[in-house]
Amino acid sequence: MSWGTELWDQFDNLEKHTQWGIEVLEKYIKFVKERAEIESNYAKQLRNLSKKYQTKKNSKEEEESKYTSCKAFQTTLNEMNDYAGQHEVISENAASLITVELTRFVQELKQERKQHFHEGRKAQQQIETCWKQLEASKRRFERDCKEAERAQQHFEKMDADINVTKADVEKARQQAQIRHQMSDDSKGDYSSVLQKFNREQHEHYFTHIPGIFQKLQDMEEKRIGRMGESLKTYADIDRQVVPIIGKCLDGITKSAESISEKQDSQMVVESFKSGFEPPGDIDFEDFTQNMKRTVSDTSLTKADSKSDPKVPSKSRNKLWPFIKKNKLMSLLTSPHQPPPPPPASSSPSAVPNGPHSPKQQKEPLSHRFNDFMTSKPKMHCFRSLKRGGSTPEDFSNLPPEQRRKKLQQKVDELNKDIQKEIDQRDALTKMRDVYTKNPQMGDAASVGQKLVEIGNNIEKLRVEVQKFEGWLAEVEGRLSARNDSSRRQSGLYDTQNTQTVNNCAQDRESPDGSYTEDHSQEPEVKVTPTEFDDDFDDEEPLPTIGTCKAIYPFDGENEGTISVTEGEILKVIEEDKGDGWTRIRRSEEDEGYVPTSYIEVYLDRNAKDS
């Protein structure tokens, strides 16, 4: 079936149809282009989503990523990132294999179609020209025939008329002959033009037009075939990434199967186990001992003389597992809230926290830790209680078990660093030997300098390892000793559970390094420093860096503050660090923070510089 023979008279319809075919192809190209944009945007959004939920370095999330469930989630995010990459592949292949190629093909198609229809119109113009020539020749032949017939009739009429002269008859006869000759010439010309037209028309409808229409048919079939191939390519582009997407999904499934509930539970134990033993039973407190006390027995409560005598002092049994971890530390650091503004007048009633405002019964800071300071033991973590303090190098601020793990981790890291330095030293040693044998390859002296530097680094790292291994051995020894001690104390509690409060005020070590005692009613117990070797260390008090004069009275009710009276002279041991508080000392053990705006500070420059 050929368009040239079947559609020889459908030139205009074929022109419209081929134009429609090109428009369909352009519509498909536009569809693929928009699909590629969607895939690209989708891949970008997936990557951003995966990046958004990735574990941030140097954050709490990085510490939590050790759990199997978190690892599985991170694996899922990584697989989704690869999954997004496959959608990018779809977008890129659709653009390069379909959009670009079909756009070029459409341009070629338009050019070819234009050329074919130009040839068709040219053939039509040619046949139309021949037709016009035929019509003109036919009309001329018809006109000449009529003119010859009229001339013949005129001659016959003149010849039959006896009144007409012979000359007029001859003239009419000649005129008729001329007209007959012209008619014969027109007839010959018309016959020639007609033959030519028939020949042109035959070539037009049986040669030119079929050839042009066949080319149009081939062009259209090529367009249709190319679109079919493109649709197949469209499917193949997606099919090619299906195995990789399947692997991504398999990775997610595998990570989900790797989640271990028991392992995560064990990690929680390893992360938060303190190494302390649970507290023993609380002993009975015999308050009838107050009736047997003498006047000298109550001398221990002299430190509470500043408290309101109407408010009875209550004994507090504080069990360390139920105390906030930073409770003790907050007592020795500056208050978290901003200091109160200075009063408008020096009247005590105008001072915040003055005597006219409701007050909460509070023991002075030095009295709170009276028993702690008896033998002058101080906690290791006191070193870091200054504002802006950092974690101690020996991790003494951590519970024993966590401290042991941190120290072990530090030792392992240092050993890895040492191994790296040793490997680098071995490589440089070989390089130096090569340079020594072949000086043209490099300078052996420069390598020797690097070897000296690496040797120094190794020595420093080994010193660090010995230091941390010493702390680690110390912690491990204390943990084993504490376990033995706890077993002995468990038997002691069973035999002494009926003792009075004077015999049952046993110190307990808390996870944050603090100890809890009941010292409100028993005589002062002298504690030797060896009992607190696990978490305390002797440290000299802060030196005095100046003096200050209180210009307003301040009744320190918050933890870590100290009360002062107007005009009182005190010692400054720590400057204002920008938070509005200054640390001062009244006596050896009575110190705390007051608002900087409530005092006039006179710093000793020599002490400050030293």
Swiss-Prot record:
<dbReference type="InterPro" id="IPR036028">
    <property type="entry name" value="SH3-like_dom_sf"/>
</dbReference>
<dbReference type="Pfam" id="PF00611">
    <property type="entry name" value="FCH"/>
</dbReference>
<dbReference type="GO" id="GO:0008289">
    <property type="term" value="F:lipid binding"/>
</dbReference>
<keyword id="KW-0968">Cytoplasmic vesicle</keyword>
<keyword id="KW-0472">Membrane</keyword>
<keyword id="KW-0175">Coiled coil</keyword>
<feature type="region of interest" description="Disordered">
    <location>
        <begin position="478"/>
        <end position="544"/>
    </location>
</feature>
<dbReference type="GO" id="GO:0031410">
    <property type="term" value="C:cytoplasmic vesicle"/>
</dbReference>
<dbReference type="GO" id="GO:0005764">
    <property type="term" value="C:lysosome"/>
</dbReference>
<dbReference type="InterPro" id="IPR001452">
    <property type="entry name" value="SH3_domain"/>
</dbReference>
<dbReference type="InterPro" id="IPR027267">
    <property type="entry name" value="AH/BAR_dom_sf"/>
</dbReference>
<feature type="site" description="Mediates end-to-end attachment of dimers">
    <location>
        <position position="166"/>
    </location>
</feature>
<dbReference type="GO" id="GO:0005856">
    <property type="term" value="C:cytoskeleton"/>
</dbReference>
<protein>
    <recommendedName>
        <fullName>Formin-binding protein 1 homolog</fullName>
    </recommendedName>
</protein>
<dbReference type="GO" id="GO:0007165">
    <property type="term" value="P:signal transduction"/>
</dbReference>
<feature type="coiled-coil region">
    <location>
        <begin position="67"/>
        <end position="259"/>
    </location>
</feature>
<feature type="domain" description="REM-1">
    <location>
        <begin position="397"/>
        <end position="474"/>
    </location>
</feature>
<comment type="function">
    <text>Required to coordinate membrane tubulation with reorganization of the actin cytoskeleton during endocytosis.</text>
</comment>
<comment type="similarity">
    <text>Belongs to the FNBP1 family.</text>
</comment>
<feature type="region of interest" description="Disordered">
    <location>
        <begin position="295"/>
        <end position="319"/>
    </location>
</feature>
<dbReference type="InterPro" id="IPR037449">
    <property type="entry name" value="FNBP1_F-BAR"/>
</dbReference>
<keyword id="KW-0963">Cytoplasm</keyword>
<dbReference type="Pfam" id="PF00018">
    <property type="entry name" value="SH3_1"/>
</dbReference>
<dbReference type="GO" id="GO:0005938">
    <property type="term" value="C:cell cortex"/>
</dbReference>
<dbReference type="GO" id="GO:0005886">
    <property type="term" value="C:plasma membrane"/>
</dbReference>
<feature type="compositionally biased region" description="Basic and acidic residues">
    <location>
        <begin position="478"/>
        <end position="487"/>
    </location>
</feature>
<feature type="compositionally biased region" description="Polar residues">
    <location>
        <begin position="488"/>
        <end position="505"/>
    </location>
</feature>
<feature type="compositionally biased region" description="Acidic residues">
    <location>
        <begin position="531"/>
        <end position="541"/>
    </location>
</feature>
<feature type="domain" description="SH3">
    <location>
        <begin position="543"/>
        <end position="604"/>
    </location>
</feature>
<feature type="region of interest" description="Disordered">
    <location>
        <begin position="331"/>
        <end position="364"/>
    </location>
</feature>
<dbReference type="InterPro" id="IPR031160">
    <property type="entry name" value="F_BAR"/>
</dbReference>
<keyword id="KW-0168">Coated pit</keyword>
<dbReference type="GO" id="GO:0005905">
    <property type="term" value="C:clathrin-coated pit"/>
</dbReference>
<feature type="compositionally biased region" description="Pro residues">
    <location>
        <begin position="336"/>
        <end position="345"/>
    </location>
</feature>
<keyword id="KW-0446">Lipid-binding</keyword>
<keyword id="KW-0728">SH3 domain</keyword>
<keyword id="KW-0254">Endocytosis</keyword>
<feature type="region of interest" description="Disordered">
    <location>
        <begin position="383"/>
        <end position="418"/>
    </location>
</feature>
<keyword id="KW-0458">Lysosome</keyword>
<keyword id="KW-1003">Cell membrane</keyword>
<dbReference type="GO" id="GO:0006897">
    <property type="term" value="P:endocytosis"/>
</dbReference>
<feature type="coiled-coil region">
    <location>
        <begin position="392"/>
        <end position="484"/>
    </location>
</feature>
